[in-house]
Design a protein with these regions (language model features):
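A short, charged/proline- and glycine-enriched loop
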Residues: 36-41, 159-165
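Local cysteine-cluster metal-coordination motifs and their immediate loop/turn environment
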Residues: 45-50, 79-90, 116-125, 166-177, ...
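A short, acidic, amphipathic alpha-helical segment used as a generic capping/interface helix at domain edges
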Residues: 221-239
């Protein structure tokens, strides 16, 4: 089960934790254990970014954007373990406390002050739940940092083909933490991109179906929430649904494929959309 995997391997899939940094191959990102010197941010990769093929592309795109902006980052690599978000949402408080204590000890040992992450679930846990356990850090979501870098001119994008994009609000980024403008500002900064809104957006946004640990449950009756949401996105006429959460990416991309919309409705993270405009030619994913 996912709980057993968390206990044994520190991630819900039960993947060997020694492979946590494999996604970063060739990018030259130092780990904290390497003694990287002064870094602006610790990049908290999260379980999905580390082990899920789709989301590995997202964290690579994020790292490439930060490198292009001259932001020095480091990772924990195999020393990172699940934040425990899923365990707490699913009612296993003991497992949450165990995982959280391990992470807080690691982060504090390295003197980490600032963290950036592309996962709103990790973001919410690190920012709002770790302080009670002795982990006090400045935590930003990658969309917030990217929007700031674009506004400051540290990150420059080239014009790309015209694209109509509908942005999907992640529950943990939006309603739980009030981050609505940053991902939209980042997308608007991309030349040739038109941002459209779905009827249910911002404070009235609609869950992708993965929240509250439902990512790890099987749907049994009724219409899947993710199917409803992709239909809503398709109705806007947009060619791309932009997301800012690994679970939203998984749920909506699967729903688009299951609903026969794979050719007409791409589901991509904000970082992937921006990274496409870093240089000529599309990137992976």
């Amino acid at each position: 089960s996912a709980f057993k995997n968390l206990e044994k391997a520190g991630n819900p899939w039960g993947v060997d934790p020694s492979t946590r940094a494999d996604w970063a191959e060739g990018l030259g990102i130092p780990s904290m254990a390497d003694g990287p010197g002064e870094v602006e941010y610790l990049f908290w990769v999260g379980c999905a970014g580390s082990f899920d093929d789709r989301n590995r592309k997202v964290v690579r795109a994020t790292a490439e954007l930060l490198a292009a902006a001259g932001v020095r980052i480091a990772i924990l690599g195999p020393e990172e373990t699940c934040t425990g978000d899923f365990a707490r949402r699913a009612g296993n408080e003991y497992l949450f406390q165990t995982l959280a204590a391990q992470n807080v000890e690691t982060l504090n040992r390295y003197g980490v002050r600032r963290i950036v992450t592309a996962c709103p679930h990790c973001f919410n846990t690190l920012r709002n739940e770790y302080p009670q356990l002795g982990g006090r850090y400045e935590v930003v979501h990658h969309s917030e940092l990217l929007a700031r870098l674009l506004a400051e001119g540290r990150l420059r994008l080239e014009p790309g083909s015209s694209l109509s994009v509908a942005f999907h609000d992640s529950c943990y980024l939006g309603r739980h933490n009030g981050v609505y403008d940053a991902p939209r500002d980042a997308l608007r900064a991309a030349p040739g991109l038109e941002l459209v809104e779905m009827p249910r957006s911002r404070e009235n946004g609609f869950c992708c179906g993965a929240g509250g640990a439902r990512m790890w449950m099987e749907e049994r009756i009724g219409t899947k929430v993710c199917d409803d949401r992709t239909a809503e996105a398709a109705a806007t006429g947009a060619g791309v649904v932009a997301v800012a959460c690994p679970f939203c990416l998984t749920m909506l991309a699967d729903a688009a494929a299951d609903g026969g919309r794979e050719e007409t409705l791409a589901v991509r993270d904000v970082a992937q959309i921006l990274a496409d405009r870093l240089s000529r030619g599309p990137r992976e994913g």
